[in-house]
Regions:
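Short loop/turn motifs that connect adjacent beta-strands in outer-membrane beta-barrel proteins
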Residues: 19-21, 53-59, 172
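Detector for outer-membrane/organellar transmembrane beta-barrel domains
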Residues: 41, 46-163, 167
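A short, acidic, flexible beta-alpha connecting loop/helix-capping segment that sits on the rim
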Residues: 70-71, 179-185, 196
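C-terminal closing repeat unit and adjoining cap/tail of repeat-based domains
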Residues: 162-180
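Surface-exposed coil loops of outer-membrane beta-barrel proteins
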Residues: 1-44, 110-114
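Outer-envelope exported proteins of Gram-negative bacteria
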Residues: 25-29, 95-97, 141, 176-178, ...
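Solvent-exposed loop/turn segments connecting transmembrane beta-strands
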Residues: 2-9, 30-41, 71-76, 119, ...
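Outer-membrane beta-barrel "beta-signal"
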Residues: 46, 167, 195-207
Length: 207
């Protein structure tokens, strides 16, 4: 919710050498068959990053773009742009991100190949803050995606908010506790609002 999924995905990629914290990547990907519908042209994606550090502060800026022409019943160009920033000062860290897209839908996966709503306009944003005390990190985030236009009768929206606690036992195991609340609305997708609340407790094993 609030971001372009799944991030950078080209199968053939060129990445520039890092220069003063700046780097860029560009590539192509070709999902030539997606649940029965074909794409005649490969997709293109590019990403630029800038990382910096000064004393106790450090941060990153990034921007990305994606484009692919879809085929099938009702061809169109699908494209999107994203911009994000991350900053950390001591134990505090924050992330802000936003995107604007055309023909990518709410999930931005598959470029709406199978969508009955045609080429729609999407946008979204995501914000997150965390604070670390010892081996325990506390975090909260909120994100929202909106989709409108095309054959949609309404503006479809998904929102999600999460509060979490993450405790590192060692370099391999992190204990996790989260509360998440999601809401979706839009007459094209739901016969009324969709609301879910989830409490999850578990662990992350890294190896």
């Amino acid at each position: 919710h609030g971001y372009m999924y799944t991030g950078f995905q080209p199968q053939i990629t060129y990445t520039t050498p890092a220069l003063g914290g700046f780097s860029a990547s560009a590539g192509i990907f070709d999902p030539n068959k997606f649940a029965g519908d074909e794409t005649k042209d490969p997709g293109f994606q590019a990403m630029a990053n800038y990382d910096w550090a000064s004393g106790a502060a450090k941060g990153s800026l990034w921007a990305g773009a994606i484009h692919q022409r879809t085929s099938g019943a009702g061809s169109f160009n699908a494209s999107g742009f994203e911009l994000g920033a991350k900053i950390g000062i001591g134990a505090f860290e924050a992330v802000a991100y936003g995107f604007d897209a055309s023909g990518l839908g709410l999930s931005t996966v598959g470029a709406l190949y199978l969508s009955p709503f045609g080429k729609t306009d999407g946008k979204g944003y995501f914000v997150q803050t965390t604070y670390t005390v010892g081996k325990t990190k506390f975090g909260i985030n909120f994100g929202e995606n909106r989709d409108s236009g095309g054959a949609l009768a309404d503006t479809n929206k998904f929102r999600s908010a999460t509060v979490g606690v993450y405790h590192s036992l060692n370099k391999y195991i992190t204990l996790v506790g989260e509360y998440n609340q999601e809401k979706g609305d839009g007459d094209d997708l739901f016969a009324g609002d969709l609301k879910t609340r989830t409490i999850s407790v578990g662990g992350i094993l890294m190896f």
